[in-house]
C-alpha cells in the first residue's frame, strides 16, 4: 500500500523568526500523533535548510522530514550559484523537488535537465519529487494527457527502474498560485493516466510510485482529493506557509 505523503513547498518565503514559529506550531499540532501510514515534509529556501533541520531535531519531529526546492544537475565543480545533492543530503534533506513548473517556465528547464537532477538526488540517497503538468492552453486544446504523459515518458527513458524510488507530482500549471483547483475527479483522471504511462514500462513500478497532486491544495479540498485511488498526497504551496493549514491538510 502506498503511503499518503504531504510535502510543503514554501517557495521564496519565510525568515528566521517565522520559520521558528512555524516549526513550533507544527510541533504542538503533531504532539497528539498523526494519522498512521502517512509521511510529511517541508521544503524551505536553501538559506533556511540548516535552521529548519536544527528545529526539527530540537522538537523531536519524527513525523516531519526536510526537503529542498531544487538541486543541481551536476555533482560538484565550477557551477556558480548551484547547490549539489550531496550538500543537501548533508543538511538533512530527504526529499528534493525537481522540475517544478516555475523552474520550467522561469529558467527554461527541460525534461532532460529534470531527469539529470533526479539522478543526482537518487545518487545522494534522497527522494526526488518529479513535477509534471500542463498549461491552460494545453488543457483547453485537449492535449493535457498527451503533454503530461510525454513528460513522464521522458523521465522513464532516463531513470528506468530507479523511478521506483521517486515521487511524481502532478501540478496543473493553470492551478498553481491562482486559487483555481482541478476537481478531485479531473485530478484523479490525470493521476490514473500517469500511472498507466508508468505501467507501460513496469507494472510493479507503477503500482508503487506515489503520485502527489500539486495545484492549490487547501484544507477545504484535501479530503476529497486524498480520497481518490491514484492520488497519494499533495505538494502544497501557499497553504503550507500557514502552519495550521498545513496541519489540517496533513490530517485530511
UniProtKB/Swiss-Prot annotation:
UniProt keyword list: Cytoplasm, Gluconeogenesis, Glycolysis, Isomerase
Pathway assigned in UniProt: Carbohydrate biosynthesis; gluconeogenesis; Carbohydrate degradation; glycolysis; D-glyceraldehyde 3-phosphate from glycerone phosphate: step 1/1
Family: Belongs to the triosephosphate isomerase family.
Pfam families found in the cross-reference section: TIM
Function: Involved in the gluconeogenesis. Catalyzes stereospecifically the conversion of dihydroxyacetone phosphate (DHAP) to D-glyceraldehyde-3-phosphate (G3P).
HAMAP family: TIM_B
Enzyme class label: isomerase
Database matches in Gene3D superfamilies: Aldolase class I
Example of a GO biological process term: glyceraldehyde-3-phosphate biosynthetic process
Protein name per the record: Triosephosphate isomerase
Its EC number(s): 5.3.1.1
PANTHER family recorded: TRIOSEPHOSPHATE ISOMERASE
PROSITE patterns: TIM_1, TIM_2
Subcellular location: Cytoplasm
The protein's assembly and partners: Homodimer.
NCBIfam families hit by this protein: tim
Binding site for substrate: 9-11, 177, 216, 237-238
Active-site feature positions: 100 (electrophile), 171 (proton acceptor)
GO MF assignments: triose-phosphate isomerase activity
Cellular component aspect of the GO annotation: cytosol
Catalytic activity of the protein: D-glyceraldehyde 3-phosphate = dihydroxyacetone phosphate
Coiled-coil residues: none
Amino acid at each position: 500500500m502506498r503511503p499518503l505523503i504531504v510535502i510543503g513547498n514554501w517557495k521564496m518565503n519565510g525568515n528566521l523568526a517565522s520559520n521558528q514559529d512555524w516549526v513550533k506550531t507544527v510541533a504542538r499540532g503533531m504532539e497528539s500523533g498523526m494519522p498512521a501510514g502517512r509521511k510529511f515534509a517541508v521544503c524551505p529556501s536553501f538559506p533556511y535548510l540548516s535552521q529548519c533541520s536544527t528545529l526539527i531535531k530540537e522538537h523531536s519531529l519524527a513525523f516531519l522530514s526536510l526537503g529542498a526546492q531544487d538541486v543541481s544537475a551536476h555533482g560538484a565543480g565550477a557551477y556558480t550559484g548551484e547547490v549539489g545533492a550531496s550538500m543537501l543530503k548533508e543538511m538533512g534533506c530527504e526529499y528534493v523537488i525537481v522540475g517544478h513548473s516555475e523552474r520550467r517556465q522561469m529558467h527554461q528547464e527541460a525534461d532532460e535537465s529534470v531527469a539529470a537532477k533526479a539522478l543526482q538526488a537518487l545518487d545522494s540517497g534522497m527522494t526526488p519529487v518529479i513535477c509534471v503538468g500542463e498549461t491552460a492552453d494545453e488543457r483547453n486544446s485537449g492535449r493535457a494527457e498527451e503533454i503530461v504523459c510525454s513528460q513522464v515518458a521522458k523521465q522513464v527513458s532516463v531513470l528506468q527502474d530507479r523511478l521506483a524510488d521517486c515521487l511524481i507530482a502532478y501540478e496543473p500549471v493553470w492551478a498553481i498560485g491562482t486559487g483555481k483547483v482541478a476537481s478531485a475527479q479531473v485530478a484523479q483522471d490525470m493521476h490514473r493516466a500517469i500511472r498507466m504511462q508508468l505501467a507501460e514500462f513496469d507494472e510493479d513500478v507503477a503500482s508503487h510510485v506515489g503520485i502527489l497532486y500539486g495545484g492549490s491544495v487547501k484544507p477545504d479540498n484535501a479530503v476529497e482529493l486524498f480520497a481518490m485511488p491514484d492520488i497519494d498526497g499533495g505538494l502544497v504551496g501557499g497553504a503550507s506557509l500557514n502552519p495550521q493549514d498545513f496541519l489540517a491538510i496533513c490530517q485530511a
